From Swiss-Prot:
Single GO molecular function: nickel cation binding
UniProt family annotation: Belongs to the UreD family.
Organism superkingdom: Bacteria
Lineage of the species this protein comes from: Bacteria, Pseudomonadati, Verrucomicrobiota, Opitutia, Opitutales
Subunit structure: UreD, UreF and UreG form a complex that acts as a GTP-hydrolysis-dependent molecular chaperone, activating the urease apoprotein by helping to assemble the nickel containing metallocenter of UreC. The UreE protein probably delivers the nickel.
UniProt keyword terms in alphabetical order: Chaperone, Cytoplasm, Nickel insertion
Any one GO CC term of the record: cytoplasm
Name the record gives this protein: Urease accessory protein UreD
Keyword field contains Cytoplasm: yes
Function recorded in the entry: Required for maturation of urease via the functional incorporation of the urease nickel metallocenter.
Compartmental location: Cytoplasm
Length: 272
């Protein structure tokens, strides 16, 4: 059975500066946990759960998330998203995030795990008004490496676009077979189980950049970490790690550094 699932959320400020979901609509394969308000970071944490086995051929899933001025929202998932083998067909995911001035949105799902023969295409568009902030992360694992199944998907297409006041900040696109992406991992010397992460940080307000040196200092044997400035505002952070555990620890270390400069990131995405 294939799904045409959707997730529609809107977050807005409420009494005492709390953030609440003023709109929530979802259909399989999406389900929401009970939101958690983090008093320290002043962020509403929402965990999106996929109660099905994973993503199958023919699935079409769509997310629309809006954060109003003065609200702060963290979206996460409890586990990896698995894209299963497809003898034919394709699965698609479209994501659209809108963040108003004075709002904050962090999207940090678990890693994407494409299985042998899968064909998955994901498009993400982020639209921010000046003064909005956010942190947007994508993680990719090479497949079921523990089962000897790595870099075996048929096609993987990941598109990401971020705009500030309508002006393009960054547009990225990966469209490769497993074998083609394996070559990049080998170039980095990260081995057959290499994992990738791509993060976009939009500060939203003036902040010192002492964090940059600390994040770049996480580049070491076993993990490649790079930081580059976007054309007008914000930063791109890229990570290549030798395995999933190393990637997870590196991302945790990056968030710990950033939380010192951006208090909204003090919310633990694994709190639920």
């Amino acid at each position: 059975m294939d799904f045409a699932g959707h997730l529609h959320l809107r977050a807005a400020p409420r009494a005492f500066g709390h953030t609440a979901l003023t709109l929530q609509s979802f259909r399989a394969p999406f389900h929401l946990s009970k939101p958690y308000w983090d008093y320290d970071s002043r962020v509403l944490l929402v965990q999106v759960v996929n109660p099905t086995a994973g993503i199958l051929a023919g699935d079409r899933i769509e997310s629309e998330i809006t954060v109003d001025a003065g609200a702060a929202l963290l979206i996460t998932t409890p586990s990896a998203s698995r894209v299963f083998r497809m003898d034919a067909g394709v699965a698609t995911c479209r994501q659209h995030f809108t963040v108003a001035a004075g709002a904050w949105l962090e999207v940090m799902p678990g890693p994407l795990v494409p299985h042998r023969g899968s064909d998955y295409r994901q498009s993400t568009i982020v639209e921010l008004t000046r003064g909005a902030g956010g942190f947007f992360v994508d993680q990719l694992m090479p497949g079921r490496a523990a089962h000897g199944e790595a870099w075996a998907w048929r096609r993987l297409c990941l598109e990401f676009e971020c705009r500030l006041d309508g002006r393009l900040l960054v547009r990225e696109r990966v469209d490769q077979s497993g074998e083609e992406l394996r070559a990049l991992a080998e170039l980095a010397g990260s081995g057959a189980a290499a994992c990738f992460a791509n993060a976009i940080l939009i500060p939203g307000a003036e902040a010192d950049e002492d964090w940059r040196a600390a994040v770049e200092g996480l580049h070491r044997d076993g993990a490649w970490v790079g930081v580059s400035a976007l054309r007008e505002a914000g930063w791109s952070i890229k990570v290549i790690a030798p395995d999933g555990a190393y990637l997870r620890e590196t991302l945790r270390a990056i968030r710990a550094v950033l939380a010192e400069a951006f208090p909204r990131m003090r919310c633990d995405p694994r709190r639920l």
